[in-house]
Amino acid sequence: KNHRFKIIVTDGVFSMDGIVADLKGVCDLAEKYDCLVMVDDSHATGFIGKTGRGTHEANDVMGRADLLTSTLDKALGGSLGGFTSGKKEIIDMLRQRSRPYLFSNSLAPGIVGAAMKVLDMISEDTSLRDRVMENAEYFRTEMKAKGFDIPDGDAAIVPVMLYDAPLAQK
């Protein structure tokens, strides 16, 4: 109660099981308790949402999350780097006080330009994103038909549940 800042941090899509976070619920909770919201959308950027903007778009909470972080090395094909976006005041503070930011190098302009081009492409044409989701659904269906326990999901992450750690390590 007596903290200057409170923050709820969540993945947009959880990498181990492909579950998409309930960001409406998270944002409602944050408003109730006067918290900031930070979403790591590394497994959603380019894949989830009407234009591929991520889980905040898919959950209709754009503008309610205070910080969004993501990577350029999944759907955006940059192979390195990432980004943090948010309200100007928060970004300015991070630029001044975030040690990882202070001691890192800027991304090469070509990587940034390529990622921006991919964002334009996937926001204008859903065919690549549709294909990824179709492939994931096909994989789910075929693995279930072979007797594997495959949970349903709304993301392209498809966990194969073995429930046997030694077997999973083989």
Where do the model's predicted regions map?
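Active-site PLP attachment segment
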Residues: 51, 57-93
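Short, small-residue-enriched loops and turns at beta-alpha junctions
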Residues: 13-17, 44-47, 101-102, 159-160
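Amphipathic alpha-helix from the class-I
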Residues: 110-130, 141-145, 164
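Active-site phosphate-binding strand-loop segment of PLP-dependent enzymes
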Residues: 1-39
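A short glycine-threonine-serine/GTX helix/turn-capping micro-motif
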Residues: 80-81, 98-107
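Short beta-strand
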Residues: 6, 104-105, 149-154
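Conserved PLP-binding catalytic core of the aspartate aminotransferase-like
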Residues: 130-139, 145-170
